[in-house]
Amino acid sequence: MRKRKTVIFIRKKRPEANSIEEIFNSLIKYLGDDVELLELPCSGASISAIVKNIHFARKHRGDINHITGEVHYIALGTGCRTLITIHDVQSIIRGGRIAKTIKKWLWFNLPLLIARKVSVISHLQKTNLSCCVLLRKRKSLL
């Protein structure tokens, strides 16, 4: 029987903010041969970067996918066999009314509709997320 391939997607490293990436880079050696850690090719939130990252995620998706960091939108490429871990809500939803609306849909509503599981790192983030996005009634936050 073939082992299931798990892919953990992390955002592209940024010098000013990379603690999550450092943690996963340290842990990957303990997770087994069937787990692969992939850094996305583009940073930032430009349309071009988002499209390239979604395409990359689709091309490299595994049997099980874990999205961590602030790139939840790549669930549009990984599909439903995805776990999204949300570390922070408020830092993503910034800007004017139009920007906030787009980010809520692209970073939260659409990915959370697609992903099979969603985890948050704290009760505060669970509350923040529940207040700002639409969640399916049967979708539980871990």
Regions found by a protein language model. Give the residues of each.
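A short, active-site helix/loop in glycosyltransferases that binds the activated sugar's phosphate group
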Residues: 115-139
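Residues at the starts of beta-strands that form the adenosine-phosphate
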Residues: 5-6, 34-36, 81, 116-117, ...
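Short, conserved loop/helix-junction motifs that constitute active-site signature segments
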Residues: 75-79, 111-114, 134-135
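Active-site donor-binding segments of glycosyltransferases and PAPS-dependent sulfotransferases
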Residues: 3-74
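Structural beta-sheet core signal
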Residues: 7-9, 84, 120, 142
